[in-house]
């Protein structure tokens, strides 16, 4: 695995040993980051179900100001720290060994600019995360990788990459109505 773009472009990162981690492929990661390119500079990012840390490290490489990584598996936490050390990213990141849903349950609204999540497929975790985000929108943008057969709540924009999909949700701006209007008036381009 490698960092695709930014200051660490071409640098190799490693996945934790074993079959428990399903790293996001380069093609999917590139498409994911391309969708977020305008929001990444100086963003505060959260990488949930972080695995190797590839998503968060890619965001940092492309200009994010800080990234918190949340991962419950000890081998993955070690891999994230090792990858961050190799890249020199330790000063602009933190790793939390914790269940992702428990972590976000304590977050206030707008704690992050961007949340990227790649939960295990077919366990309902992606949908649970979206429901938690809707209850308290802890970021402006939530992106979730999931299997194309996993049902997610409506309201996101899904892009498919083989059997994987990435769905992007945006929180309404303060004062926006649910239907996308601001103060009862349609926004330009809405």
Can you annotate each of these PLM segments?
Residues 1-190:
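Class I S-adenosyl-L-methionine-dependent methyltransferase catalytic core
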């Amino acid at each position: 695995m490698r960092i695709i773009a930014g200051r660490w472009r071409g640098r190799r990162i490693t996945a934790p040993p074993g079959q428990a981690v399903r790293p996001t492929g380069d093609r999917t990661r590139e498409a994911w980051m391309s969708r977020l390119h305008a929001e990444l500079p100086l963003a505060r990012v959260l990488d949930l179900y972080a695995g190797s840390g590839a998503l968060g490290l890619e965001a940092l490489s492309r200009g994010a100001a800080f990234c918190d990584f949340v991962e419950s598996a000890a081998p993955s936490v070690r891999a994230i720290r090792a990858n961050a050390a190799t890249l020199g990213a330790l000063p602009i990141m933190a790793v939390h060994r914790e269940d992702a849903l428990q972590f976000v349950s304590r977050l206030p609204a707008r704690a992050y600019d961007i949340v990227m999540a790649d939960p295990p497929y077919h366990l309902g975790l992606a949908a649970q995360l979206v429901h938690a985000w809707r209850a308290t929108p802890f970021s402006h943008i939530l992106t979730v990788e999931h299997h194309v057969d996993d049902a997610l709540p409506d309201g996101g924009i899904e892009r498919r990459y083989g059997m994987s999909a990435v769905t992007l949700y945006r929180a309404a701006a303060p004062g926006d109505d649910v239907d996308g209007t601001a103060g009862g008036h349609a926004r330009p381009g809405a």
